[in-house]
Amino acid sequence: MLNHYLPVLIFLLVALVVGVAPLLMGSSLGPHRPDSEKLSPYECGFEAFEDARMKFDVRYYLVAILFILFDLEIAFLFPWAVVFDQIGMTGFLAMMLFLAILVVGFIYEWKKGALEWE
């Protein structure tokens, strides 16, 4: 039974070696000669005038999280719709429970004012 998973295990091991081996070789075989010029911040050939990080409003992150949430909802909804005629009432009720939980979460976010930009 586990013989069917042997190609997957070999693939994962080869992928791990291909991904990690160049990193280890570069860090162990490469020259390590840091000086003050190499360690200084560099911005388009000039020293950085100020901190390059800009402050973002937290609401942008909230919108991004809500987008990911509803994008995942669609990712679950499409395969469910494809096999809808084969899964019966149990699959239907499971998806309705999933959608109800998402709707309750959306209503909670709306009532808390997380979607308002005032």
Swiss-Prot record:
Membrane topology of the entry: Multi-pass membrane protein
Protein location: Cell inner membrane
Transmembrane segment boundaries: 6-26, 64-84, 87-107
Enzyme Commission number(s) of this protein: 7.1.1.-
Pfam families: Oxidored_q4
Major subcellular location class: membrane
Plastid among keywords: no
GO molecular function, one term: NADH:ubiquinone reductase (non-electrogenic) activity
Class in the EC hierarchy, top level: translocase
Reactions that this protein is recorded to catalyse: a quinone + NADH + 5 H(+)(in) = a quinol + NAD(+) + 4 H(+)(out)
GO CC annotation, single: NADH dehydrogenase complex
Gene3D superfamilies linked: NADH:ubiquinone/plastoquinone oxidoreductase, chain 3 (1.20.58.1610)
Keywords noted in UniProt: Cell inner membrane, Cell membrane, Membrane, NAD, Quinone, Translocase, Transmembrane, Transmembrane helix, Transport, Ubiquinone
Cystines in this chain: none
Keyword Glycoprotein attached: no
Subunit comment: NDH-1 is composed of 14 different subunits. Subunits NuoA, H, J, K, L, M, N constitute the membrane sector of the complex.
Protein task: NDH-1 shuttles electrons from NADH, via FMN and iron-sulfur (Fe-S) centers, to quinones in the respiratory chain. The immediate electron acceptor for the enzyme in this species is believed to be ubiquinone. Couples the redox reaction to proton translocation (for every two electrons transferred, four hydrogen ions are translocated across the cytoplasmic membrane), and thus conserves the redox energy in a proton gradient.
Entry's family note: Belongs to the complex I subunit 3 family.
Record's protein name: NADH-quinone oxidoreductase subunit A
The organism of origin for this protein: Acidithiobacillus ferrooxidans (strain ATCC 53993 / BNL-5-31)
